[in-house]
Amino acid sequence: MYKIFKIMIIFVLTVSLFGCQKKEKNVYTETYTLQYFYLEGCPNCENFTKNGLPLIKEEFGDHMKIIEYDMDDTETLTEVKAAYDEVINSIIDFNQDDYGFGPFLVLEGYYAQLGVSDVDDYLENLIAAIKGEELNEPGEIDTYYYLRDGKVKEE
């Protein structure tokens, strides 16, 4: 009986020591820029704004500059269109049928993504891109676009 009790105590201590450790935090030394093009009333955009942006801000803090572009705002339409077209022109093989849809996210110097199926996967992709690792498989509504001078290359 004592032996079983001893094994149980060791098991509980092992689980409490190793099972509850925090994930090692990534350390960033550079500042990255994420351009976020969205549409008002777009459910996927609203989900990303509500759930994705806070994850990115928590992970990167001051190391991620997020520039938000409301593609429905008539007052800034010229500025938004110029920024959007500049990105589109830097993409290899952009599908013109995707023009104007959101959310459209561009990690400057790395890659662009249209649509976000899962905000956690998107965050993992940002981290992977910056580390020079392979991106996750695109989700059901995700389209990856590769920049001519981007650090992420199509596999």
Ranges and model annotations:
Residues 40-47, 104:
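C-type cytochrome heme c attachment motif
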Residues 26-42:
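Short active-site neighborhood of thiol/selenol oxidoreductases, capturing the structured segment around
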Residues 16-19:
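C-terminal motif of bacterial Sec signal peptides marking the signal peptidase cleavage site
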Residues 61-81:
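Thiol-based oxidoreductase modules, predominantly thioredoxin-like and allied folds used
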